């Protein structure tokens, strides 16, 4: 089983892996949120 030896080592590994600092929302077809006139929300989420 995996055992963590050092939290500092884990943080260093995560810093190396986390090259992308956030979610890219360039693709508008992937996430859509709409409100109708009454204020009701509707979302389409595609994976």
UniProtKB/Swiss-Prot annotation:
Metal-binding listed as a keyword: yes
Gene Ontology biological-process annotations: DNA recombination; DNA repair; DNA replication
InterPro entries, per the entry: NA-bd_OB-fold, Phage_T4_Gp32_ssDNA-bd_sf
UniProt keywords, alphabetically: DNA damage, DNA recombination, DNA repair, DNA replication, DNA-binding, Metal-binding, Zinc, Zinc-finger
One GO molecular-function entry: DNA binding
The organism's place on the tree of life at top rank: Viruses
Function: Binds preferentially to single-stranded DNA and therefore, destabilizes double-stranded DNA. It is involved in DNA replication, repair and recombination. Binds ss-DNA as the replication fork advances and stimulates the replisome processivity and accuracy.
Record's subunit section: Homodimer in the absence of DNA, monomer when binding DNA.
Misc remark: Interacts with the polymerase and the uvsX and uvsY proteins.
Protein name as annotated: Single-stranded DNA-binding protein
Organism encoding this protein: Enterobacteria phage RB6 (Bacteriophage RB6)
Organism phylogeny: Viruses, Duplodnaviria, Heunggongvirae, Uroviricota, Caudoviricetes
Originating gene: 32
């Amino acid at each position: 089983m995996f055992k963590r030896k050092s939290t500092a080592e884990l943080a260093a590994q995560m810093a190396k892996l986390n090259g992308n600092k956030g979610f890219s929302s360039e693709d508008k077809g992937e996430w859509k949120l709409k409100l109708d006139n009454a204020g009701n929300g509707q979302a389409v989420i595609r994976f």
